């Protein structure tokens, strides 16, 4: 039986190259290589890598980098911002990213956001296009 972890996060140490947006109460790093080693140790064949929003916000470049280094082990999900006027282009570009399997809509203003919000509509329309 193939075992897939449905949600993992990996991240580098906080550096000038890839600075964190916030400093959570987590280990200093859990790199892609460390994640693969941990998966191998417990018999996990693959995982859905969700880019760590709390650290990298909407930049999924580390998730893409890890997926490229470990093809076949990770599928990747990128957070998207409904308040970004270019979010439809972001989604369209993401759909062409090798290993991309989804987006994560980050609702920073959920209490005030209406279901017919234009940003949500842009995301859903872009995601539905083939």
Model-predicted regions and their roles:
Residues 1-58:
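An N-terminally biased module of ancient metal coordination in phosphate/nucleic-acid-related enzymes
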Residues 54-130:
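Active-site gating/metal-coordination segments in enzymes
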């Amino acid at each position: 039986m193939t075992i897939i972890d449905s949600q993992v996060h990996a991240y580098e140490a906080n550096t000038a190259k890839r600075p964190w947006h916030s400093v959570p109460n987590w280990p200093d790093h859990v790199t892609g290589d460390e994640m693969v080693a941990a998966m191998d140790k417990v018999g996990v064949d693959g995982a859905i890598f969700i880019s760590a929003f709390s650290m990298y916000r909407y930049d999924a470049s580390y998730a893409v980098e890890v997926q490229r280094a470990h093809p076949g082990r990770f599928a990747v999900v990128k957070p998207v911002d409904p308040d970004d006027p270019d979010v439809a282009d972001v989604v369209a570009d993401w759909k062409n990213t090798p290993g991309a399997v989804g987006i994560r809509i980050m609702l920073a203003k959920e209490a005030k956001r209406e279901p017919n919000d234009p940003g949500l509509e842009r995301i859903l329309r872009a995601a539905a296009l083939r």
